[in-house]
């Protein structure tokens, strides 16, 4: 992972700490600010290469969607955006897009988990690669806060968790960890650590 990249919510080591040296102790928003861009939402931005990416709601009313947007890190201009629908969800509009996207250090591809439990895979240029509706396939249910888990990239896997109330071997309300192949989106495994969802 190149120094300076922050490919997922808690950084390259998943501990919330930067390896960068010489960072300022206080931000000067008047003298050293390079750019500012209106964005909104609750997602934590990630940095991969010369892109700053985050999720947020886009549109209003019947046109409300979730969006993954990547900005040019040098200028703040929109490099690309990808929108997808939020359905089968009781998440109110102001709580959409809480989770952060994650970038695969090996490919630069971006993975996002929407509030309605939709997983989307995008190329580093914002092209749609695949998607899976965990809500439809595993009866994942949403809460007032939506899905707040950011995808974890582990080797060839994209791992998400969801509270599900499914049937068959995954029956009963529980938290499940669902591992998807990062290239195809195929389900590799579903883990059920036990216990009731909170």
Where are these regions (language model features)?
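Noncatalytic, solvent-exposed loop/strand surfaces
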Residues: 1-198
């Amino acid at each position: 992972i190149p120094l300076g990249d922050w490919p997922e919510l808690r950084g390259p080591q998943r501990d919330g700490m930067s390896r960068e040296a010489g960072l300022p102790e206080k931000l000067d928003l008047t003298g050293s600010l390079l750019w500012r861009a209106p964005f909104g939402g609750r997602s934590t931005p990630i940095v991969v290469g010369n892109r700053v990416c985050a999720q947020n709601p886009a549109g209003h009313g019947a046109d409300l969607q979730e969006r993954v947007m990547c900005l040019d890190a040098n200028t703040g201009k929109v490099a690309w955006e990808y929108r997808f629908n939020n359905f089968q969800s009781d998440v109110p509009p102001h709580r959409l897009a809480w989770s952060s996207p994650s970038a695969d250090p090996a490919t630069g591809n971006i993975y996002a988990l929407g509030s309605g439990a939709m997983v989307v895979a995008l190329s580093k240029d914002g092209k749609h690669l695949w998607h899976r509706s965990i809500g439809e396939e595993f009866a994942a249910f949403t809460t007032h806060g939506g899905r707040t888990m950011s995808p974890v990239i582990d080797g060839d896997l994209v791992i998400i968790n969801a509270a599900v109330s499914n049937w068959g071997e995954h029956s009963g309300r529980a938290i499940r960890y669902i591992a998807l192949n990062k290239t195809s989106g195929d389900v590799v495994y579903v883990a059920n650590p036990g216990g009731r969802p909170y």
